Amino acid sequence: MSLSESLAKYGITGATNIVHNPSHEELFAAETQASLEGFEKGTVTEMGAVNVMTGVYTGRSPKDKFIVKNEASKEIWWTSDEFKNDNKPVTEEAWAQLKALAGKELSNKPLYVVDLFCGANENTRLKIRFVMEVAWQAHFVTNMFIRPTEEELKGFEPDFVVLNASKAKVENFKELGLNSETAVVFNLAEKMQIILNTWYGGEMKKGMFSMMNFYLPLQGIAAMHCSANTDLEGKNTAIFFGLSGTGKTTLSTDPKRLLIGDDEHGWDDDGVFNFEGGCYAKVINLSKENEPDIWGAIKRNALLENVTVDANGKVDFADKSVTENTRVSYPIFHIKNIVKPVSKAPAAKRVIFLSADAFGVLPPVSILSKEQTKYYFLSGFTAKLAGTERGITEPTPTFSSCFGAAFLTLPPTKYAEVLVKRMEASGAKAYLVNTGWNGTGKRISIKDTRGIIDAILDGSIDTANTATIPYFNFTVPTELKGVDTKILDPRNTYADASEWEVKAKDLAERFQKNFKKFESLGGDLVKAGPQL
């Protein structure tokens, strides 16, 4: 079947030109053309990378995510009053109209068609075809997904198709049961995703992550929102779970270790494997000193999003006037220390949960029991500091099951069950690492956090003397090489330890309230959480 014929199946006709699997050189030329206007236009920065703006949407739009309700989607973890999530149902009738709208938008014009893999394991990867009219969106997926060899592209038949019609608006969204003129919709029967009225690149990346999160656990394979790395021999694999901004990319990109990937992984009988062929790093306040590897990856073929660039092409990473969620996507080979030739490694021995606790309660590292591992995985806690009108900064807690509830398409307990089975089989140990704040009012330094990670990875934490933290019953080391001893017990960072107690009780209550929805899983699990 010719490419035009396959596009016609998706409702796209009359393409005036199809650029199929463009090279980085072709994309650079296309996205920086002087004739481009608005959000299509890329600006070349002095670092060599192109910067683009994504308009109103500088992040994903979870309120606009829908899944077609049909026989193929019966296993989906639908949103409910008890378990609010982003998996909202939409009808087949609405889907037909949205597909026609995307088809109309993408017809009779030049297009980019990019064929890529999601998943480094041949047996379980998805073959994905992306169709879009915007050059830099084709660049984004070329950076972020796994690029097939010429041999693999011969006779490429997609398992999943993504139509990105970011210029089209859903005018009749109310009658279709949608939330706004924007829609990100999946149809599991047709194996297709449609994107309408949002330019944010991450919708394509996280859309396919949601699909891997559906297909893999049903086969007993863990699908995880985590980064992963291994030692220089490729034997001592570690995975880092965490929500956005907790340090997944920063901590897994370590000059002493080989990076497997920075955000999405599977864990099967062969070990841990990356879903992606690139990294999508936050760049707010990025510095060469603190994150040399990420800094070095921002060069020609990297794609910056929503950063401020002056007339001379100079980038201001501290400027968050457009968004705090400034990003860069780059092919994984922009990082020197990576696992080659395929981003996979043996089963993990160390599982690290990253949490940026703005309450200043959690220890910088806790050694978790098996039941605590399940409890804190299902809780998926982090907290942000949100400014209030009078300049007081109040911590806002986030509980996101499995450190990625926004991307789960099956119930959280399924992911926990599969992860724990994999950990038991490999003898992996789990640790909760707080990359947030303590009683000093300052964020725990990257230097101390890196020292903690080193102690986890070299095993020295397992032989350290320990103490127990009240309410949470956490086991914490009392001394670790290269880490300020004072911070290991969070109570020592407060001028008055009773201040920690007040905050600890408050946070413990929040954990208990959040976990009520999992109480049916049994008393042992509930007891593994904070006790007042």
From Swiss-Prot:
Disulfide links within the chain: none
GO BP terms in the entry: gluconeogenesis
Pathway(s) this gene product operates in, as recorded in its UniProt entry: Carbohydrate biosynthesis; gluconeogenesis
Effect of pH on activity: Optimum pH is between 6.7 and 7.1. The enzyme is stable from pH 5.0 to 9.0. It completely losing activity at pH values lower than 4.5 and retaining some activity in the pH range 9-12.
Residues holding ATP: 206, 225, 242-250, 291, 327, 443-444, 449
Pfam family, one: PEPCK_ATP
Cofactor note: Binds 1 Mn(2+) ion per subunit.
Subcellular location: Cytoplasm
Cited PROSITE patterns: PEPCK_ATP
Domain of life from the UniProt record: Bacteria
GO CC annotations, alphabetized: cytosol
HAMAP family xrefs: PEPCK_ATP
Annotated function: Involved in gluconeogenesis. Catalyzes the conversion of oxaloacetate (OAA) to phosphoenolpyruvate (PEP) through direct phosphoryl transfer between the nucleoside triphosphate and OAA.
Name of the protein this chain belongs to: Phosphoenolpyruvate carboxykinase (ATP)
Organism: Anaerobiospirillum succiniciproducens
